[in-house]
From Swiss-Prot:
GO biological processes: fatty acid biosynthetic process; negative regulation of DNA-templated transcription; negative regulation of fatty acid biosynthetic process
Record keyword Transcription regulation present: yes
Species the sequence originates in: Exiguobacterium sp. (strain ATCC BAA-1283 / AT1b)
Record-given protein name: Transcription factor FapR
Tagged with keyword DNA-binding: yes
InterPro entries per UniProt: HotDog_dom_sf, Thioestr_dom, Transcription_factor_FapR, WH-like_DNA-bd_sf
Length: 189
């Protein structure tokens, strides 16, 4: 059954408000219309393309990263609350995959998660001392990986326990428990 244009546009706007990272291709499948129709609807509704939406969300939700430069974070960081939680988005492109099967290289998913765990630390020196990681399924060319990190415990020994879960859509594709060393204020003097 075809949904009338006004109703589709209302639902499109709600969907994008709920998930600003959704791609036009996914929206076209969800609403059973062409990608061009989705783009025209977005233009009429003055909704920017996904990359602009990601930048907008990021500009509103970022503390200043202390432990890394932003160029060292793998993926686009869109949310950061130091010593609490962080989110990054990585679109899997040709340079991230094996050429023969278009499956993402494991070290790319690890690098996204590890750099997010380190960036989360509210200290100028933060280093990974331990990582226990699990890959749940293959990630393919063109998929979007959303990594979510949260601090589980600030220990008294200068270490912080961080958990990172990475998703494609609603499906968890990677998770890891990281122990991050932080220098601490007393050692900076």
């Amino acid at each position: 059954m075809r949904v009338p244009k006004k109703e589709r546009q209302r639902l499109l706007q709600e969907t994008i408000e709920h998930n600003p990272f959704i791609k036009d291709e996914e929206l076209s499948k969800q609403f059973s219309v062409s990608i061009q129709t989705i783009r025209l609807d977005r233009m009429e509704l003055k909704i920017p393309e996904v990359r602009e939406r990601i930048k907008h969300v990021a500009s509103e939700h970022l503390d200043e990263v202390k432990s890394l430069s932003m160029s060292e974070v793998i993926g686009d960081m869109i949310d950061l609350k130091l010593d609490d939680s962080a989110i990054s988005v990585l679109d899997i492109e040709k340079e991230h995959v094996f050429s023969r099967n278009e499956i993402a290289r494991g070290h790319v998913l690890f690098a996204q998660a590890n750099s997010l765990a380190v960036a989360l630390i509210n200290d100028e020196l933060a280093l990974t001392t331990k990582a226990d990681i699990r890959f749940s399924r293959q990630v393919h060319l063109g998929e979007r990986v959303v990594a979510k990190a949260r601090v589980m415990k600030l220990r008294g020994d200068g270490r912080t326990d961080v958990t990172v879960e990475s998703y494609v859509g609603e499906e968890c594709v990677f998770d890891g428990d990281f122990t991050i060393y932080r220098r601490g204020e007393e050692e900076q003097a």
